[in-house]
Swiss-Prot record:
This is Probable GTP-binding protein EngB. Necessary for normal cell division and for the maintenance of normal septation. Residues 22-197 form the EngB-type G domain. HAMAP family: GTPase_EngB. Belongs to the TRAFAC class TrmE-Era-EngA-EngB-Septin-like GTPase superfamily. EngB GTPase family. GTP binds at residues 30-37, 57-61, 75-78, 142-145, 174-178.
Length: 210
């Protein structure tokens, strides 16, 4: 998939204030400082469209970017930032959880994990939450430039082995590095397949409650 145009649309404090749910959305999430906004910029081909920072917790709202006038990429707040106040964490958790549970045009959630680290408890709990609520997701491993090629192979195998028992079907994995553009084509191809296969809004937790 070739990106011809990508524009920032809006930042929202709640899923109810997000743009109309008339296009497929691919959202990005991960622990704070996993390289989420940098990855969004790499995929979009723009260095500063999504705001990045060495300080965790920079993204605090639901940020929508319209791509090729056809679909949205969404930069979500990261989770697991210990330095955030309890009130901040509660607010972010509520905002993100409601978006994931109720946003009917969420076609796929890209869960970003640092490839240098073994699967973390907070990530595994989050992935189980996605599975329990039938939220479609794929795994994106970041910062692959920080380790050797053999370590990348070994870590990828570790993630697949760890996550396999929890998932009902095989997951899509993409190995990336925002620094050297590794995995950009693979990520774009994955997004292209998701957008091409998007047909109708998914059944959300809100739909089930009605």
């Amino acid at each position: 998939m070739h990106i011809q145009e990508a524009i920032f649309v809006t930042s929202s404090a709640t899923y109810k204030k997000c743009p109309p749910a008339d296009k497929a959305e691919i959202a990005f999430i991960g622990r704070s400082n996993v390289g989420k906004s940098s990855l969004v910029n790499m995929i979009l081909g723009q260095k500063k469209l999504a705001k990045t920072s060495a300080r965790p917790g920079k993204t605090q709202l639901i940020n929508h970017f319209l791509v090729n006038q056809k679909y949205y990429l969404v930069d979500l707040p990261g989770y697991g930032w210990a330095q955030a106040s309890k009130t901040q964490r509660i607010g972010w958790n509520k905002m993100v959880n409601q978006y994931l549970l109720y946003r009917e045009n969420l076609a796929c959630l890209f869960v970003l994990l640092d490839i240098r680290l073994p699967p973390q408890k907070i990530d595994l709990l989050f992935i189980n939450f996605l599975i329990d609520n039938d939220i479609p997701f794929a795994i994106v491993l970041t910062k692959a430039d920080k380790i050797s090629k053999q370590q990348v192979v070994n870590q990828l195998a570790t993630f697949k082995r760890t996550l396999a028992p929890s998932t009902k079907e095989s997951l899509n994995y993409v190995v990336t590095s925002s620094k050297n553009q590794a995995g950009k084509i693979e990520a774009l191809n994955c997004i292209g397949q998701i957008v091409a296969g998007y047909q109708q809004p998914r059944l959300t937790a809100l739909n089930r409650e009605l």
